[in-house]
Curated annotation (Swiss-Prot):
The gene is H1-1. It is found in: Nucleus; Chromosome. GO terms for cellular component: cell surface; euchromatin; nucleoplasm; nucleosome; nucleus; vesicle. The modification Phosphothreonine is found at residue 201. Restricted to thymus, testis and spleen. Present also in lymphocytic and neuronal cells. Increases in testis starting with a low level at day 5 and reaching high concentrations in 20-day old and adult animals. Disruption phenotype: Deficient-mice developed normally until the adult stage. No anatomic abnormalities are detected, mice are fertile and they show normal spermatogenesis and testicular morphology. The lack of phenotype may be due to a compensatory function of other histone H1 subtypes. H1 histones are progressively phosphorylated during the cell cycle, becoming maximally phosphorylated during late G2 phase and M phase, and being dephosphorylated sharply thereafter. This is Histone H1.1. The C-terminal domain is required for high-affinity binding to chromatin. Coiled coil: none annotated. Keywords: Acetylation, Chromosome, Citrullination, DNA-binding, Hydroxylation, Nucleus, Phosphoprotein.
Length: 213
């Protein structure tokens, strides 16, 4: 009995060790980074909703929530974010609170913020239209490049230079040949004048004397 007891204890310790090892092997999962919500932020949505409204007295919180919900924003989950966004926009000066206090009143865009909101809308529309038109431009540019490439091998400048060079010695030789015969012709008439001799006049025949009878 004394021998079997330590064997059982050793077996129990052996089974406990791998279990502990398995626990230590499990790596701790790294905290997954929070994904930023795609699309515009809450403050941008609020500014767009206020700028689109035509109420002169300002937009109430209820009307603002309705416009945000119509745009596809989850108002119930992000109720606190909407209130914080309104407060931050009022502090920055982009929104002006016309009625009430805090986030429960009515809000209106500041005149300076209105011009900024219009420019942002125009820039967003221009970017969207530019992104849609980009593939057409690239295709046209590629076609233009392919047409322009065969025009490059027009470089016969070397042939023009070589044709000009032989013309110069030809002009010089022609001038020398023209001058040399002129000099020879001028010398020949002088020699002919020296050789001219006057013809001799023939002697008159003497009359024969008459014979004596």
């Amino acid at each position: 009995m004394s021998e079997t007891a330590p064997v059982a204890q050793a077996a129990s310790t052996a089974t406990e060790k791998p279990a502990a090892a398995k626990k230590t092997k499990k790596p701790a999962k790294a905290a997954a980074p929070r994904k930023k919500p795609a699309g515009p932020s809450v403050s941008e949505l609020i500014v767009q909703a206020v700028s689109s409204s035509k109420e002169r007295s300002g937009v109430s919180l209820a009307a603002l929530k309705k416009s945000l919900a119509a745009a596809g924003y989850d108002v119930e989950k992000n109720n606190s974010r909407i209130k914080l966004g309104l407060k931050s926009l009022v502090n920055k000066g982009t929104l002006v609170q016309t009625k009430g206090t805090g986030a429960a009143g009515s809000f209106k865009l500041n005149k300076k913020a209105e011009s900024k909101a219009i420019t942002t809308k125009v820039s967003v529309k221009a970017k969207a239209s530019g992104a849609a038109k980009k593939p057409k431009k690239t295709a046209g540019a590629a076609a233009k490049k392919t047409v322009k490439t065969p025009k490059k091998p027009k470089k016969p400048a070397v042939s023009k230079k070589t044709s000009k060079s032989p013309k110069k010695p030809k002009v010089v030789k022609a001038k020398k040949v023209a001058k040399s015969p002129a000099k020879a012709k001028a010398v020949k008439p002088k020699a002919s004048k020296a050789k001219v001799t006057k013809p001799k006049t023939p002697a008159k025949p003497k009359k024969a004397a008459p014979k004596k009878k």
